[in-house]
Amino acid sequence: MIDATPEPQKNGKIINWCHVDVGDEYNETDENGNKVPRGIICGAPNMAAGEKVVVTLPGAVLPGDFKIEPRKTYGHISNGMCASERELGLGDNHDGIILLRKYGFTPEEYEKLQPGDDAMHLLHLDQPLLEINITPDRGYAFSYRGVAREYHHSTGAVYTDPATALGKKAPVTQGLPEGAKSDIEVIVDDKNPIHGVVGCDRYYARAVRGFDPASHTPNWMRRRLIRAGMRSISLAVDVTNYVMLDLGQPMHAYDLDKIEGPIVVRRANEGEKLTTLDGKDHDLSVEDLLITDSPNGERGSRVLGIAGVMGGLYGEVTAETKNILLESAHFDQVSIARSARRHKIPSEASRRFERGVDDQLQPAAAQMAAELLVKYGNGEPSEHPTDYNTVCNRRPILFKASEVARVAGLDTDVNTISDILTDIGCTVAGGGNGEFSVTPPSWRPDLNEPCDLVEEVARLVGYDEIPVTVPPAPVEGRVGLTAEQLRKRQVADELAEYGMVETLSYPFVGDEDYKNFALDADATKKVSVEIANPLAGDRPFLRRDIIPTLAQTVQRNLRRGVE
């Protein structure tokens, strides 16, 4: 920034007429053919001569399809724009433009920055992104930790689980000396468990006191959050989100000074409401699992958030928060999935909880978050966290090595099978006569039956190793599709060419569908086929028209946030 001349306006605003050196390649050319700094209008309050800033030039297109062009404004031709974080999609900060001296560069690195340097490279916006399609059973892969594990399986690269070292550093919660007081009392009072499964079997809470509310998120962390599709909000919130991305454990940060213990995890009562962090009001269902606290001694009377989905406005971390309570919990997958869909909140946390989170990860995640808050926010972590833990040990699976050949057709020796199961984290015992007792790791809730273990062996040996067997063709009779099958396929292909999508839905309807389409339920039932053992008790009839079940599909997709 060569100079910045303040110019008061009639409306009371003060704008700066600036001359900015953007390097000889991008500077303007005067009438004598000399390169001169660009003239740019800027209203940012932190604009000052001598600053090194990020400039977007004419022709650039910013997020929101905002095109940068030379334009006359405030009596000058502004030939570019000095950019803020929000304008570049780097965060929500729009209080001023980006000043590179505050952007994480060392003094030596800052001194080397020259006009004309590529800001995309300086801000690490030019690095490639890896997009991974993760199947619903691979909840652990929704993290750097999980992806690194899969990379190890794929390439043989050395893998060290970061949660192991973090867990060893976490404070001991068992056998505390008499009189030692934990951070806050936690009670789980689930009177309406879904399918008999209590909604929360582990709740780990740890306080960090003396946090500096003026501390900023380090730029490396902000970059990683943004590149993962998340917004940078504040250090405390960013730390919990980063731990989730890194380890796979969703977390929540509360303002400890606003929380009154005990914390009670319970189901919602009829008629309760909640305003979530995004400012939306929600009518709560009796199936919703809630995090509540106890103001004035009234146990569980104030709702703090929908467990595993989104927190409420009360208790959130603000710019004045000095003491933080970290929540690191394990919730029932079905409870979280239903609440997220019911309230149309497909949050990053709910996506992980509904797929299954490691039930032994909570202390390690809280330890990592505490270390980051100490390093960048000067906080002091508590040594007496609360750990409500009723997690049951995993049931061993009796597994015969011969199942691999029987189910997958792979001729794999016993030692290889044992090595593969051990490598994915299982505890393998036995092996005599080809029989194992296999205990799956805590991060793999999808491994429950012998066939699940066969799938893992086949996946890591390689599906391409499965022998190909061509089914024998019939000796007599017609070969291939019938004329009717060919006609149906041709029609489907033709409609698909016009952009239409085929919908396959269950053909079951009931009273609710008749009511939605103003049909006479009694009359319709008389001419409908009733199923003796329906999949859903409220839809026991076969449809006579496809429209009601198409409507069911649309409704289901909308509930899941699909437009």
Tell what function each PLM region has.
Residues 173-197, 201, 369, 388-397, ...:
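Self-splicing inteins and homing endonuclease
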Residues 151-191, 377-404, 410-411:
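Terminal amphipathic helices with adjacent charged low-complexity linkers/tails
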Residues 60-95, 306, 313-368, 387-394, ...:
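Internal insertion modules embedded within essential enzymes
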Residues 2-8, 16, 155, 160-162, ...:
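Glycine/proline-enriched, intrinsically flexible loops and inter-domain linkers
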Residues 146, 397-560:
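Extended, well-folded interaction surfaces typified by the phenylalanyl-tRNA synthetase beta subunit core
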Residues 213-241, 255-256, 262-389, 501-563:
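TRNA-recognition modules of translation machinery and tRNA-sensing kinases, especially anticodon-binding
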Residues 1-178, 207, 300, 325, ...:
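Phosphate-backbone binding interfaces of nucleic-acid-interacting proteins
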Residues 112-134, 180-227, 333-353, 397-398, ...:
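Residues forming anionic-ligand binding surfaces in small-molecule and nucleic-acid pockets
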